[in-house]
Amino acid sequence: MSTGTVVQVIGAVVDVEFPQDSVPRVYDALKITGEGACNGLVLEVQQQLGGGVVRTIAMGSSDGLRRGLEVANSGSPITVPVGVATLGRIMNVLGEPIDEAGPIGEEERYVIHRAAPSYEDQSNSTELLETGIKVIDLVCPFAKGGKVGLFGGAGVGKTVNMMELINNIAKAHSGLSVFAGVGERTREGNDFYYEMEDSGVLDKVAMVYGQMNEPPGNRLRVALTGLSIAEKFRDEGRDVLLFVDNIYRYTLAGTEVSALLGRMPSAVGYQPTLAEEMGVLQERITSTKSGSITSVQAVYVPADDLTDPSPATTFAHLDATVVLSRQIASLGIYPAVDPLDSTSRQLDPQVVGQEHYDVANGVQTVLQRYKELKDIIAILGMDELSDDDKTMVFRARKIERFLSQPFFVAEVFTGSPGKYVSLKDTIRGFKGILDGEFDHIPEQAFYMVGSIDEAVEKANKKK
């Protein structure tokens, strides 16, 4: 194992000089072995500058780091604990426990930089994953072993939606889950831990956090740490759920690291390697013949602009996109999913069946027509519409309200108990509204209910 010395420190970027015959490889993990506060600090090699000098990114605070400190080369990339020992534990980017519950006690470690499964090893599945959330199951159904993105600006409910998905899927799904908190709030990580503990599924979840107060190196690599843990479960033949909150912070950390390394920025100031970095992560999140990884990723949309390079690059890798709209949230309709913007590859009559496809298509057609008529209504009023258009508007308003749903994880704020709606009930409810079966029920009865039966019951109570 070779040793070198720190020759330059610029924030999180540290240059280390080694003898010419033992220069570390790119991505090798180095460790500060000198005296002081930085003893044990891990550095990851990013570039070889020549003359035995390597440029590294610190995986922790570089406060107190100085030139001349001794650095040891581990000879391999960062390794993290994997396997059942990680379940119920909270770890940092290096796989070290941060929950004060003692050592992990793992039997095996994986390196965080791994090749994606080969083309022959990958497998596709068209099996649907029921979420219990009406708007998602109807308009943008999830595939088991697929990749899903939750897109939305600040404060429209990405994390709450993700928590509800974890609550509904992780409880109903007997498999294991891995949660990677990438550059998000520490408070949310804390809430998530207690949420899992209260629901009794903590022993099925491994948590990896690199929160927003951490250096960019941690935030850039923590998604790979979580993914490595998920890959181990998949390779053992299990079906695993991988939740990443938030993939945008992964991109942002890459931007910070890129700037620190002196690379020329590209469009909107992002790193020139944006597409490649995203591809390296996303290509590994895949299902093989032995097991599956179903991934749900929250994607922050800067300034609500879906054409921003970061969300635009993420779109290409996903099977389903759930777009959260500020306009829908402002109407008080939660989850604020935009049924006209959200898409899924699974919404195909050969996959979901003809009835589901027709109902979803019908809902989107009615909502689109209502959107077009809004300007006419605003200027001339409802009286100027034809009878057919009036009927369509009334049904569209009922559909809009019926797309809302009380969440289990939001019970504390709303005071109304959460509802899980089966796919069969969802299709039955929307089909009934489209066919005019519930034209006699006032639109208020459809707001914040589960199944259509609850809406009917609510209307009868009001009479």
Swiss-Prot record:
Reactions catalysed, as given in the entry: ATP + H2O + 4 H(+)(in) = ADP + phosphate + 5 H(+)(out)
Pfam families reported for this sequence: ATP-synt_ab, ATP-synt_ab_N, ATP-synt_VA_C
EC number: 7.1.2.2
PANTHER family linked: ATP SYNTHASE, ATP SYNTHASE SUBUNIT BETA, MITOCHONDRIAL
One GO cellular component, as annotated: plasma membrane
Taxonomic path: Bacteria, Pseudomonadati, Pseudomonadota, Gammaproteobacteria, Alteromonadales
Protein source organism: Shewanella frigidimarina (strain NCIMB 400)
Gene name in the database record: atpD1
Subcellular location: Cell inner membrane
Family per similarity comment: Belongs to the ATPase alpha/beta chains family.
Protein name: ATP synthase subunit beta 1
Source domain of life: Bacteria
Subunit structure comment from the entry: F-type ATPases have 2 components, CF(1) - the catalytic core - and CF(0) - the membrane proton channel. CF(1) has five subunits: alpha(3), beta(3), gamma(1), delta(1), epsilon(1). CF(0) has three main subunits: a(1), b(2) and c(9-12). The alpha and beta chains form an alternating ring which encloses part of the gamma chain. CF(1) is attached to CF(0) by a central stalk formed by the gamma and epsilon chains, while a peripheral stalk is formed by the delta and b chains.
PROSITE patterns: ATPASE_ALPHA_BETA
Membrane topology listed for this record: Peripheral membrane protein
Function (record text): Produces ATP from ADP in the presence of a proton gradient across the membrane. The catalytic sites are hosted primarily by the beta subunits.
GO MF terms held by the record: ATP binding; ATP hydrolysis activity; proton-transporting ATP synthase activity, rotational mechanism
List of residues binding ATP: G152, G153, A154, G155, V156, G157, K158, T159
UniProt keyword terms in alphabetical order: ATP synthesis, ATP-binding, Cell inner membrane, Cell membrane, CF(1), Hydrogen ion transport, Ion transport, Membrane, Nucleotide-binding, Translocase, Transport
